[in-house]
Amino acid sequence: MVALYLWPVYHPFIGWPPGRPLNADRPPYWLQVNHHFFFVLYSFVAMGILTVFEWDMFFPDLLDAFVLTTLPIRNSRLFLARVAAIAIFILGFLLDANFLAPLVIPASFDPPNLTRLLAGHILAVLGSGLFSAAFILALQGVLLSLLGERLFRRLSLILQGLTISALLMLLLLFPVLSGAVPVFLQSDSRAVLFFPPFWFLGIYQRILDGPGALPIYTRLTETGCLALLITLGVAGLAYPLAYLSRTRQLVVGSGTQDTRSWAAGPANGLLNATLLRSPVSRAVFHFISQTLMRVQRYRIYLVLYGGVGLSVVVSSILRLSVEHGRVQMEVSADVVRASIAIVAFWTIAGLRMAFVSPGNRQGSWVFRIVHGRPPVAATAIEQLRAARTWVLLWSTLISLSACLGARSIGSAELRSWASTASLMLIALGMCLVLTDVFFFNGMTIAFTGDTPRGQPNLALTVLKYFTFFPFVIWIPVEFELWIARSILHFALAAGVIGAAHFGLDRLHRGMVKEHCGMPGLEDDDEDFPMRLGLRY
């Protein structure tokens, strides 16, 4: 798609690109370099995210130990089969993610030397993606070999979240970074040699420009080739050691450990005495907490959404400007205000994605036996309210922390007490209303819903996010200054938030009562008519 978009940039026609004559020359040199840089960066980010997402699949799990080790297959053959599977997976996705661009680039770029362009493009994007995947695999192997399984498990989620955030930040910051690329590459700073995407951009331009390439491209090419070889070597040496460590841990076992927290007792006691006064709400609330701590799949969802949110926040706040040949960073007050809504939105969206995933239905039989299915309306309301309380508490804690962080890096106008109070009110209101909106149609306890039979409409899902997300960001940017202007405005904003919450809560109660009034299904009943929305 990007290659198709670039066609009118190199071949202008009437009206597009705006303000560019039909007989215009080729784009400036550094603009062409930025176009090449995007493909290198895309391959780097895509392969990195894919490798992080499949982090746990590169090593055997308990099911592999129970099933495969009982077969008459040598351990060395099992190891080589997994290595081959990893290689096929990485190389297959690397080709799949990049094979379309070389088919379109010749027509879009209309290069003077097609052979050099295709050779530079293919080698650069393949090397960039391969380095990204190999680096993450090598990092995982080294840490697992040195730290052991138990300590590695404690750090893996943090590493996954930070890695995804960093990779997405690179991609989202490309429009900002592209303006500074000429300054970086024309400077004599050695910092350029420590940025991996520049290495493979150097390979691209060194092959494309030939002997007339800038000297920096030769240095970047040498650094990139050496780094790729070292990374592949480290991954090849560390993976067998990590594989043996993981296999030994599966056979011997990791032992028992006390997972209780010294701070959980007083916190749970305070919650039970205030927000969770009924046994039903306590059961659901603590069921959610324990399930998230126990099931790896849900934590991966939270890591992915957290990484997306953090990358969007950082890429929105950070601005690079070039003045007098130097790159400077700037922070906009409006973007700092919008970051509060971004954090709240992606936190609650990630929790909803985890809650509706039917990955722990084994625990649903307890609620069904005790309360029935569907339960009486009052019980169902308590169950769903406990889940929303859990989401509200954590999203509020994260959003208020982001609010204080935004205040510390913002301009002087954001550090006044009136502005701080308005930002905190917006953060609390966003968490309250977004929790009501995201969980408005929820009728089941978290993690216990049925597996959907049909595939969701991806286009419709993306459209919902693209239409709702900008509106959420617009609210704090538009109303923060108005709220901070006077106490009356603050009170009016709080009243609007409260009215929206109580209105959504009342509508949700009505939907829950209607749902609970429908006849339930037994295990041996034919449930197809029920899935059509019909009742008999």
Question: Model-flagged regions — what are they?
Answer:
Residues 75-104, 374-405:
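Selective transmembrane-helix segments that form parts of the transport pathway or gating/packing helices
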Residues 71-73, 143, 147, 370:
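Short helix-loop-helix connector
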Residues 73-77, 257-264, 372-373:
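Membrane-cytosol interface motif
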Residues 50-71, 351-369:
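Transmembrane helix boundary and interhelical loop/hinge segments in multi-pass membrane proteins
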Residues 144, 362-377:
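Helix-loop-helix connectors at the membrane interface of multi-pass transporters/channels
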Residues 133, 279, 357-360, 372-373:
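Residues at alpha-helix boundaries and the short loops/turns that link adjacent helices
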